[in-house]
Amino acid sequence: PPEYEHPFTVDVMPVVRQADNSLLIPSTRTRQWSTANPEYLIEQVRLHHEDWSFFRPIVRVLKNWRTGVTSETRIKSLVMEVLALQCLPRSGSRPEALRQFFTAAAVQVNLGVEDPAGHCGLIQPDLDTAALRDALLDAADLADRACDQAARNDTDGAQRTWQELFGPDFPAPAKRTGPRAPAAPVPLITDSPQG
């Protein structure tokens, strides 16, 4: 039921299928019919995932990340899915893909996030673009730091930085509370004559 903390809901609406496979959907706001083709988006997601098997899991991570963005309006999950289609690579490691996504999406969001099928225009006309862009830029900085830490073999630091970006649900080692243990002394080896 909707009154639960995490309800499972399904939206159902009447549609009329057109000859080109697009759908006519009634809009109560405009009192007109809107054209859409959700099957196009589904196919694009399938193709991207076929090329890079981490696509769908990363999209889920990004949709969860958006809920922590402070914004005048709630960011629709479809906005994140379309940005992922536009900005996630089709190969590579997950950390590098996230780094690339946040950097590219911070630019892309300024151009508007539109229906990839070309029917509806902007997906979320009331999107707080400035807030989302700022959050994407901050995320890009954190992703850069995490990737740089990993490149320096500071995996604990990298994991903590990813946790800073994605929240406490992201697993990371505990922060050090004391100084590092000193390195064991290196014995002095001298070359002395034998015999």
Q: What do these predicted regions represent?
A:
Residues 1-23:
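Conserved catalytic core of two-metal-ion nucleotidyltransferases
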Residues 6, 48-49, 119:
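Histidine (H) residue identity feature
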Residues 16-71:
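Long, contiguous, structured domain-core segments that constitute the functional module of a protein
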Residues 54-165:
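Conserved nucleotidyltransferase catalytic core and NTase-mimicking acidic/glycine-rich helix/loop elements
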Residues 159-195:
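Non-catalytic terminal regions of proteins
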